[in-house]
């Protein structure tokens, strides 16, 4: 540039006034396109952030209760207040009557029927009824037609008890039951009955035999998620001839677990037991409510071996 030449300035009209710079149409189009792409990317990032912040289990319509903890599951009662209703022996069809425990909160819940063992009454499993109901289930603990009823008879009576809750109980009970989500449990011969009914009703969501007894050792026809709880000092239904072979015979294609209590006898399920309560609730929550928040307690499961309350635990994890 010559030493005294004027520097280029804004475009001027004939009168020396500055003129507006006109952006070419192609450049305006490019700027608009970049702005739109930036806005879309920002919106996508916002939606992704919101999605990641939302709980993964929020879509489960069966989820009930707060996030579970060891302390919550090991406590004597869960987060729900419970009411109870008597099922009269004279009004019950196909079983000996019982007691129904249900959450007071007006909602729908899975339903569970529990049978006592040989010579036992519902009183021997009453603690389980109230404990499980307090975690968000409708539960019936039954008396059998006679205390000497055998396992297959107890299977039929468990089935009748489920039907009673769905069809014949009070409206307070019936209105709270989701009849598509049913489970069974039982102690001793009631545990054998639980296995028998599970082999006959693949629509059940869960089965939990407790120190089970049955002459049949092959349960390969069961298609229901099953947790078997045995006791290492059981001399009535020794785990070597009952709980363990029962578990081993269940197909590996189903969700199943075996928990053996350490230092416990055949009658461990008849009094409040922290381990039985905790893992029974976790199993029912996982498979009746499809609540994966409880998987953490089942997979990998409790620590077993020396100095623990569990002698052995094995399963078909992951669930």
Swiss-Prot record:
Activity regulation as described: Activated by magnesium ions. Activated by calcium ions.
The entry's localization annotation reads: Secreted; Periplasm
Q: What residue stretch is flagged as signal peptide?
A: 1-58
Q: Which residues bind poly(ethylene terephthalate)?
A: 118, 189, 213
- Please name the catalytic residues of this protein: 188 (nucleophile), 234 (charge relay system), 266 (charge relay system)
Zinc listed as a keyword: no
Residues in coiled coil: none
What species is this protein from?
Answer: Thermobifida fusca
Tell me the temperature dependence: Optimum temperature is 55 degrees Celsius. Optimum temperature is 65 degrees Celsius.
* Primary localisation category: secreted
Q: What class of enzyme is it?
A: hydrolase
The alphabetical list of record keywords is:
Disulfide bond, Hydrolase, Periplasm, Secreted, Serine esterase, Signal
Q: Which InterPro entries does this entry report, sorted A to Z?
A: AB_hydrolase_fold, FrsA_esterase, PET_hydrolase/cutinase-like
Annotated family = Belongs to the AB hydrolase superfamily.
Q: How is it used?
A: Shows promising applications in the laundry industry as a cleansing agent, as it is thermostable and tolerant to surfactants and organic solvents. Has potential for application in biological recycling of plastic waste products.
Q: Which Pfam families match?
A: PETase
How does activity shift as pH rises or falls? Optimum pH is 8.
Write the protein's name.
Answer: Cutinase cut1
Disulphide-bonded residues: 299-317
Q: What Enzyme Commission number(s) apply to this enzyme?
A: 3.1.1.74, 3.1.1.101
Per its record, what are the GO molecular function terms? acetylesterase activity; cutinase activity
| Known function | Catalyzes the hydrolysis of cutin, a polyester that forms the structure of plant cuticle. Shows esterase activity towards p-nitrophenol-linked aliphatic esters (pNP-aliphatic esters). Capable of degrading the plastic poly(ethylene terephthalate) (PET), the most abundant polyester plastic in the world.
Reaction catalysed by this chain? an acetyl ester + H2O = an aliphatic alcohol + acetate + H(+); a butanoate ester + H2O = an aliphatic alcohol + butanoate + H(+); pentanoate ester + H2O = pentanoate + an aliphatic alcohol + H(+); an octanoate ester + H2O = an aliphatic alcohol + octanoate + H(+)
What GO cellular component entries does it have?
Answer: extracellular region; periplasmic space
